[in-house]
Amino acid sequence: MSNPLAVIVGAGPGIGAATARRFGSLGYDVALVARDEARLTELGTSLQAAGVTTGWTPCDVTDEARLTLAIERFCGHSGRVDVLVVNPSRYRAQRSDETSAADLLADLAVGTAPLLTAARAVLPTMRAQRTGTILATGGGSADRPFPGAATLGVQKAALRNLSLALAEDLAPDGIHVATVTIRGTVAEGTPFAPDVVAQVYADLAEQTASDPAGWYRVVDLTADGVVPVG
C-alpha cells in the first residue's frame, strides 16, 4: 500500500515548508505547489535529502486550470490523497479607501479562491476513498482588520466562510475541512512559529479518523495555545 499523500499549496519558506516537513516526518509523501520555482526546488530537494518522497510543481495559484492539473497529476501518480493544505495569501499595504475593486478581486484570487480550486481537484480521489482532510491557513484579520492592509482581512474572512461551507457540504463524504485562525504574527520562537502551526495541521489530520461529530472546523491558534471555536 502506498504512503499517504499530503499536498501543500502555497509551499513557501514559512508555514508551507514547516507543514511539508511535519507531514514528511509522519511518513507521508509530500507534493508541493508554489509560484517561486527556486524556493520550491530548494524545499523539495531538502525534503528528499531527509528521506521524504517529494514532488513539486511551480504554479501561479490564480491559474485555475494549471493548479487543478498540477493537483490532479499528483493524485493520479500517488493513487490517493489524504491531506490538502492551502496556505496562500497576499499582503497589500493599502488602506480600504485606497483600494480599488480590481485590487480586492486580485487579492481574493490569491488568498481565497485557491482553496476552492484545490478542494475541487482533490474531491474525486477523496470521495472515492471516503476520507480526506482539507486545511486552510486563516488569520485574525478575518474579524479584526489589519491596519493599512484592508484586503488581507477580506481574504481571510472569505476563506473562513468558504471553509465552513466546504466542511458542511463534504462531511457526509467523510472529508474533514478545517481552518486555523492564527491570532498573531508568524515568527520563529513564538507561539505562532511555523512548526507550531504545522503541528496543529497534523493534529487536525489525525482527528479525521475519529467520529465526524467531534471534528473541529475552526480553531484559533492563540498565545495560550489551540482553542476550538467551531
Language model features with spans:
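Conserved glycine-rich cofactor-binding loop
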Residues: 12-13
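Conserved glycine-rich Rossmann-like NAD(P)H-binding loop of the short-chain dehydrogenase/reductase
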Residues: 28-42
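Rossmann-fold cofactor-recognition segment
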Residues: 47-65
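Amphipathic alpha-helical dimer-interface segment in Rossmann-like NAD(P)H-dependent oxidoreductases
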Residues: 76, 110-128
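Conserved NAD(P)H cofactor-binding loop of Rossmann-fold oxidoreductase domains
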Residues: 85-93
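Catalytic Tyr-X3-Lys loop
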Residues: 90, 97-116, 159
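Catalytic loop of short-chain dehydrogenase/reductase
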Residues: 107, 133-158, 164, 171, ...
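C-terminal helical subdomain
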Residues: 172-230
